[in-house]
Curated annotation (Swiss-Prot):
EC number: 3.4.11.19
Primary enzyme class: hydrolase
Keyword terms of this UniProt record: Aminopeptidase, Hydrolase, Protease
Gene Ontology MF: a single term: aminopeptidase activity
Annotated active site: S62, K65
Substrates-to-products reaction catalysed: Release of an N-terminal D-amino acid from a peptide, Xaa-|-Yaa-, in which Xaa is preferably D-Ala, D-Ser or D-Thr. D-amino acid amides and methyl esters also are hydrolyzed, as is glycine amide
UniProt binding sites for substrate: D481
Upper lineage: Bacteria, Pseudomonadati, Pseudomonadota, Alphaproteobacteria, Hyphomicrobiales
Role of this protein: Hydrolyzes N-terminal residues in D-amino acid-containing peptides.
Single Gene Ontology BP annotation: proteolysis
Name of this chain's protein: D-aminopeptidase
Regulation: Inhibited by beta-lactam compounds such as 6-aminopenicillic acid, 7-aminocephalosporanic acid, benzylpenicillin and ampicillin. Inhibited by p-chloromercuribenzoate.
Sequence similarity: Belongs to the peptidase S12 family.
Name of the coding gene: dap
Length: 520
């Protein structure tokens, strides 16, 4: 690590309100367990003119997951202790069940339950109760990949963990977090508040400077996967606790941040509620958080005893800020990727037949392409005539085939170019037996729309757009959780006579959900 440059950090922090436009936020940097930068700006509530301060509590969203796993290790023991309880929880499974460690490492193969709420007809701003979460999770019978083989983000993993921990200990997660984690770490105001509608100390905002900023509505009951509210000072205390216990091999963060692997022995990018990253040759551990109106990110570099924290009450780039703060603190130089012009043969849609996932590519200018594959668009640098990559994805084109690799996910796909037009006979009623949910597709004046129906209600109508023969895209930009599932990929199946018999519906968070056509 080069010499620590506090002035460079301070210079960057002064630019945050201009480059990340929104109501307010708070950031901190720690070195050797001491706070070297602690700053808040803007407003916790625009209408009441309540200022944002380091003491202002905000939802830390999915950053909560590491604390759930910390309670597991501290009050239960190793994840394997709960494997039998998980088997009883997922009692409808028709194939190999994941282990509790698979849940902790996001290798379970379970489809994300927030994505599945869309298929079950949920209102994005509706109430979601604990019993509804259990009803959805306990009806699952399949995974979208064999447990332990790949990485896929799944909030439901941690919701199940919370249920299992409470069942095993006979105590609430609220009590366990306070007693086992927050009090020992000196996180004086941190608290699990499961019902997001009850939190009113700070307002989270949707929107931007073009549309304006409006208070975001959240009426979800969280447990295990999110729900903790904490101030910047609480998060600073967590980083100081991590540093103070750094040499204790039995210390909770040492145990949380250990290396994890996939079933084939390959290194995994995630474990026990922590994301693993690397910058400047240094290993980082941390996590991001997102809920409608909120963004949060923390990173810790054990080798250099460095930590960075960013918390926003708007949907801005807190993850980007925390990572840039870490790079500045480490003295990692910035470099511009050398790019070549993107040939038009890249552009269009590409299908992986096994997973039903679609990669859509379009020109973004200056040697870049905008790719849609996961939960949101990612910018890809074209680094050669037939090669492009982003921070998450590498693709190589060979004629009408793209080889896609996401090394962190242990995922390799072979995708074929979609050519030709889609048949216009998709209107009908489709049923997912596993979810006990329906998808209704209608033709209204030559335009197709789809609506989801299930135990959570009936959704609005969503537009459908053809991507190629028997492949359609159904964008969903608002859901209960953030980010939304993005584009649902609908891949239709036909019999020997050419009649549609069913389809698979999927997105990166929830792949290959089978639907059969109901003849009416």
């Amino acid at each position: 690590m080069s010499k620590f440059d506090l002035s460079a950090l301070e210079t960057f922090v002064r630019t945050i309100p201009q480059h990340y436009k929104g109501p307010g936020g708070a950031v901190a940097v720690l070195k050797d367990g001491k706070v070297v930068l602690r700053h808040a700006w803007g407003f916790a509530d625009l209408s009441t003119r309540k200022a944002m301060t380091p003491e202002t509590r905000m939802p830390i969203c999915s950053v909560s997951k590491q604390f759930t796993c910390a309670v597991l290790l501290d009050s239960v023991g190793e994840p394997e202790v709960l494997d039998d309880a998980l088997a009883a929880y997922l009692d409808k499974f028709a194939e190999k069940r994941p282990s509790v460690r698979d849940l902790c490492n996001n290798q379970s193969g379970l489809r994300d339950y927030w994505a599945l709420t869309v298929l079950c007809g949920a209102d994005p701003e509706g109430v979601f109760l604990p019993e509804q979460a259990q009803s959805l999770l306990r009806r699952l019978k399949t995974t979208h990949f064999a447990p332990g083989t790949h990485y896929s983000y799944c909030n439901g993993n941690f919701r199940i963990l919370a249920d299992l921990i409470e069942q095993h200990t006979g105590r609430s997660l609220i009590e366990l977090l306070s007693e086992r984690i927050f009090q020992p770490a000196g996180m004086k105001t941190a608290e699990l508040i499961p019902d997001t509608a009850l939190f009113d100390e700070c307002t989270g905002y949707e929107g931007d400077t073009v549309r304006g900023f409006l208070p975001a509505v959240n009426r979800i009951h969280w447990m295990g996967d999110a729900g903790i509210c904490a101030s910047l000072d609480d998060m600073i205390a967590w980083e100081q606790f991590i540093d103070a216990t750094r040499d204790d091999e039995s210390g909770i963060y040492r145990r949380l941040s250990g290396l994890q692997t996939f079933s084939d022995g390959a290194a995994a990018p995630y474990g026990l509620g922590l994301k693993f990253e690397e910058t400047g040759g240094k290993r980082l551990t941390g996590h991001g958080g997102a809920l409608r109106g909120w963004r949060c990110q923390r990173w810790h570099c054990a080798d250099e005893r460095l930590s960075t924290i960013a918390m926003f009450n708007f949907e801005g780039g807190a993850s980007d800020v925390a990572f840039k703060l870490m790079n500045i603190a480490l003295g990692v130089p910035t470099s511009e990727q050398v790019r070549v012009a993107a040939d038009a043969v890249w552009f269009g849609s590409w299908l992986d037949h096994e997973t039903g996932l679609v990669l859509s590519l379009e020109d973004a200018g200056r040697g870049r392409m905008k790719a849609r594959f996961g939960t949101g668009p990612e910018m890809m640098d074209v680094v050669g005539e037939n090669e492009a990559r982003s921070s998450m994805t590498a693709i190589r084109r060979d004629g009408d085939t793209i080889h896609l690799a996401r090394e962190d996910e242990n995922l390799s796909l072979t995708m074929q170019r979609l050519k030709g037009a889609a048949k216009q006979d998709i209107a009908g009623h489709y049923r997912s037996d596993e979810l006990e949910a329906d998808l209704l597709i209608v033709d209204e004046g030559g335009a197709f729309y789809g609506a989801f129906e299930g135990f959570l209600g009936k959704s609005d109508m969503y537009s459908l757009y053809e991507a190629g023969p028997d492949v359609w895209l159904l964008p969903v930009q608002r859901s209960m959780d953030a980010p939304s599932p993005g584009e649902w990929k609908l891949v239709f199946h036909r019999d020997a006579k050419g009649e549609i018999t069913g389809m698979t519906v999927g997105c990166w968070l929830a792949r290959h959900v089978d639907y059969r056509r109901i003849q009416e």
